[in-house]
């Protein structure tokens, strides 16, 4: 099965009532993890890594430094604040998939605009829950970040041998020009500061410094910090 090329979005079907796995994670060394799928019903291949943060999963998934990676979240309650249109670190997700211990929890936050699962479907991102994330994290720690294929199929039908071959055949991140993929495609100005919870908007400041930033995959929060510091900010791309 070929990796997702983002040529179209595939809506995830409702979860089946049976205990049959609806998603798998297959590593290049042959390790197999079965679980419950969520998000988009697609297949992606990338480098499997882990993140121990307790909050900020939307920022992490849209962080350009995670381009080409499938992220294992070690904190169990992923999804509890939902998702919104303000907390992206770039215009679109850079990560390729999500691995969790539990299915995303229902959002309970006043800034939430959608559930995490709906957000992942909208961005063509597959997820797998029910994975022993501690065991997977130890595996990554001891053996290094492996290539993996994450496949979400609501029908629960998987060609494990083909997925394992796809993982083995992926060339890996070494040598990839990821900056081209995560860089903005046009020059722009930036005037958005940090989020202010009292006014429910991004702050702006009087500019005291003229700054030109060359974008090689810059996080939006870095740019917000420059605005907070009083910079008149322009972005140029490579």
Predicted regions mapped to residue ranges:
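Flexible inter-domain linker/hinge segments
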Residues: 20, 140-210
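A generic structural motif
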Residues: 230-233
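Glycine-rich phosphate/diphosphate-binding loop of Rossmann-like nucleotide-binding domains
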Residues: 214-216, 220-225
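Conserved small/polar residues in nucleotide/adenosyl-binding loops
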Residues: 236-238
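Class I S-adenosyl-L-methionine
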Residues: 121, 224-227
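Generic start-of-chain signal for non-secretory N-termini
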Residues: 1-29
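Feature captures the catalytic cores and cofactor-binding loops of soluble hydro-lyases/lyases
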Residues: 18-22, 28-159
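Short active-site oxyanion
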Residues: 124-127, 208-212
């Amino acid at each position: 099965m070929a990796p997702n090329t983002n040529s179209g979005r595939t809506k995830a079907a409702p979860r089946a009532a049976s205990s049959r796995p609806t998603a798998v994670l297959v590593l290049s060394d042959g390790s197999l993890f079965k679980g419950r799928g969520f998000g988009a019903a697609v297949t992606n291949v990338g480098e499997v890594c882990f993140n121990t943060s307790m909050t900020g999963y939307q920022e992490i998934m849209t962080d350009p430094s995670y381009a080409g990676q499938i992220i294992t979240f070690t904190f169990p309650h992923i999804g509890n604040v939902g998702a919104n249109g303000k907390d992206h670190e770039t215009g679109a997700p850079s990560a390729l998939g999500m691995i969790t211990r539990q299915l995303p929890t229902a959002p309970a936050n006043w800034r939430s605009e959608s559930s995490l699962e709906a957000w992942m479907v909208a961005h063509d991102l597959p997820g797998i829950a029910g994975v022993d994330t501690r065991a997977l994290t130890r595996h990554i720690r001891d053996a290094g970040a492996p290539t993996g294929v994450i496949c979400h199929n609501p029908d629960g039908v998987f060609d494990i041998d083909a997925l394992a071959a796809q993982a083995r055949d992926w060339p890996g991140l070494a040598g990839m020009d990821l900056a081209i993929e995560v860089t903005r495609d046009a020059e722009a100005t930036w005037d958005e500061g940090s989020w202010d919870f009292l006014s429910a908007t991004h702050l702006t400041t009087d500019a005291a410094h003229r700054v030109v930033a060359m974008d090689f995959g810059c996080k939006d929060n870095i740019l917000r910090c420059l605005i907070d510091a009083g910079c008149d900010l322009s972005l140029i791309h490579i």
